[in-house]
Amino acid sequence: MSYPVGRKMSIDKSTPRNQDPNFKLLLLHPKYLPTWLGMGFIYLCKFLPYKVIIFLGTLLGYLLHGVSPHRKQIAKANMQLCFPDKSEEEIDDLVKGHFKNMGIGVFEIAIAWWSSKRTIENLKLSSKNVNIFKELDEDQGVLILIKHSTHVELDIRLMAQEIELGGMYKPQSNEVMNYLMIKARNRYVTGAINNHQAKEAIKWINNGQKFLYAADQDYGEKNSLFISFFGVDAATVTFPERLSKSGVKIVMANVSRNKERFDLEFHEISDFKEEGSVLKEVNEFYEKFILHSPENFLWTHRRFKSRPLGEESIYSEWKSRDKRRSKKRQSRE
């Protein structure tokens, strides 16, 4: 895909509008009953003290750790690559901590999606370098890069409390989850679009919008460069670098959780000219953010799925599944 950057778009200067999801009868299909019941329970958790949410999430995390052997293998393989100096026992402890925080993140959705503005304001939040946006021209677009954390939904809500921003989301395969996610995010995110609308994102950024994007996952080799990530070559999407070369400011954002406290920080990426230099700094910031709280990064994603020519797959146990998916895609084309 080529991105039309490098020039101002002649588009409407008004703030982009969110598209409210339509409630369809399909959402009432019996197959979605477990989803409605589960999310209904999580909704009720918004009335609970945060300590209780952490307790319930911890229990769920331990359950997920016990019933998710494949995801556990992926997390362990990623951590072994990124932390070669850690012993197997230390890696296992990190994996357990990661699943614990994933469970907490599920219950934190109640706060992120359905809590009032006052509840969010009452959370213990420390912000650093928020003034970075006031120093920019009013019409200057900003791409804000975040990481996929176990509490990413709450991260987005906390950032939206500080600055007005748009963002990109990946449509969920579960129709009910997709409906609830978009409906909730539309309350606090301006201009939410899906990951198949990259051109719309560029228009909004070139129009002076602040836009959230996560560049810490493997999106395939087509629009990526192999850049070091914890000393391992990782397919890193070139979207931020393309925008940087067009004059768009790139800002790294991170939210870290320490018990019941949240720390939010922003850092501006330098303007580089050499190919890959922006992506190198982006990954270095991601490494720094992850090291601050390693158990909260989304290790269950196959970050090193794409490999340089000649390298063996790191996730050998997923080879057969990938082949099946590839055949299905080819049959649909």
Where are these regions (language model features)?
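Flexible, glycine- and charge-enriched loops at secondary-structure boundaries
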Residues: 88, 191, 275-276
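Catalytic core of membrane glycerolipid acyltransferases/transacylases, capturing the structured
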Residues: 138-196, 221-228
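Membrane-anchoring hydrophobic helices of lipid-metabolizing enzymes
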Residues: 3-146, 179-183, 327-333
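Non-catalytic C-terminal accessory region of glycerolipid acyltransferases
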Residues: 4-11, 92-96, 134-138, 161, ...
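General small-molecule cofactor/ligand-binding pocket signal
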Residues: 126, 191-193, 267
